[in-house]
Amino acid sequence: MFKHVTVLLKETVDGLDIKPSGTYVDCTLGGGGHSSYLLSQLTDGGKLIAFDQDEIAIQNAKEKFSSYGEQFVTVKSNFRYLSEKLHELGITEVDGILFDLGVSSPQLDTPERGFSYHHDAPLDMRMDQDAPLTAYDVVNSWSYEQLVRIFFQYGEEKFSKQITRKIEAYRENKAIETTGELVELIKEGIPAPARRTGGHPAKRVFQAIRIAVNDELKVFEEALESAIDMVKPGGRVSVITFHSLEDRICKTTFKRNSTTPQLPQGLPIIPDEFKPKLKLITRKPILPSDIELEENNRARSAKLRIAEKR
């Protein structure tokens, strides 16, 4: 069963300021939590298009929301193709779009998917099971310099070089095939005092590899720009991020699109191409409540930002 505790459920959907007959997009269907709450607010004229790369998530949602008929449409695709896929459906603008960038719990909790450092499993980490690049390829084929870069940039791992040296030495003799093998090498690369603080020692490296395998940051940056273009004036974009790299992209993109660039003084009017596209609904991110954190530990790093098309 595809179970997943949805983070910031009401805040994210209510932040879209739902119009009952509007057209909305859930870019990250997952367990269908946000979609379920959103669909419950639509009348017969309303529609929700939901994206996911995971076939299990798609099939589960089709069964779960079958009573909504043509109001609910699934798209098995990476949300980097948001604009393209919506145009294929004959949709040129929408009333709101949401992103929940966390890895869904079923993916984390299914050992054979290779996302979790708590289970021994083949190194995979692909969100899209048909994609060619796996965690095995990254760990065994990428150069010392490439691994150090992603561990440091994507995982913000202080001991990137030490961990990569352990990986290099090990793979000279045999391939690193499982998450368990990789966890042991990560532990060896981190000094004992540092291992005792800051959560699981493999957390940052696993995050970095997952981001690299799925090209997550570039994909999100492209999709967020597409979302801003696809939303009609008065429509909104809600984004939940789970680490500082994603949040920085969201914050920067929203800020750039909501401010007027420096223009020569004395211009009688601001040319249309320089007018801000967005109005910020959240100046500072919305964080989970204490009650939500008690009920769902995975919500602790979540941040929600919302912007409205001008």
UniProtKB/Swiss-Prot annotation:
Its EC number is 2.1.1.199. GO terms for molecular function: rRNA (cytosine-N4-)-methyltransferase activity. It is found in: Cytoplasm. It is an enzyme of class 2 (transferase). It comes from the Bacteria. Its main location: cytoplasm. It catalyses: cytidine(1402) in 16S rRNA + S-adenosyl-L-methionine = N(4)-methylcytidine(1402) in 16S rRNA + S-adenosyl-L-homocysteine + H(+). Pfam families: Methyltransf_5. SUPFAM superfamilies: Putative methyltransferase TM0872, insert domain (SSF81799), S-adenosyl-L-methionine-dependent methyltransferases (SSF53335). GO terms for cellular component: cytoplasm. The keyword Transferase applies. One of its GO terms (biological process) is rRNA base methylation. S-adenosyl-L-methionine binds at residues 32-34, 52, 79, 100, 107. Gene3D superfamilies: Putative methyltransferase TM0872, insert domain, Vaccinia Virus protein VP39. Keywords: Cytoplasm, Methyltransferase, rRNA processing, S-adenosyl-L-methionine, Transferase. NCBIfam families: 16S rRNA (cytosine(1402)-N(4))-methyltransferase RsmH. PANTHER family: 12S RRNA N4-METHYLCYTIDINE METHYLTRANSFERASE, S-ADENOSYL-METHYLTRANSFERASE MRAW. Specifically methylates the N4 position of cytidine in position 1402 (C1402) of 16S rRNA. Belongs to the methyltransferase superfamily. RsmH family. HAMAP family: 16SrRNA_methyltr_H. This is Ribosomal RNA small subunit methyltransferase H.
